[in-house]
């Protein structure tokens, strides 16, 4: 999980999800793209 100031979709499979007021990027196919907005 990378913590970034700005999260972007790196691939078309990435999904942007809002949990507890934070933005997350999740990718089932390739989990190395997991990000959270700091």
Swiss-Prot record:
Domain of life: Bacteria
Any one Gene Ontology BP term: translation
Swiss-Prot/TrEMBL keywords: Ribonucleoprotein, Ribosomal protein
GO CC terms of this entry: ribonucleoprotein complex; ribosome
SUPFAM superfamilies: Ribosomal protein L36
Keyword Magnesium attached: no
InterPro entries to which the protein is assigned, alphabetical: Ribosomal_bL36, Ribosomal_bL36_sp, Ribosomal_L36_bact
One function term, GO molecular function aspect: structural constituent of ribosome
Family statement drawn from the similarity comment of this UniProt entry: Belongs to the bacterial ribosomal protein bL36 family.
Record's protein name: Large ribosomal subunit protein bL36
Originating species: Porphyromonas gingivalis (strain ATCC BAA-308 / W83)
Gene: rpmJ
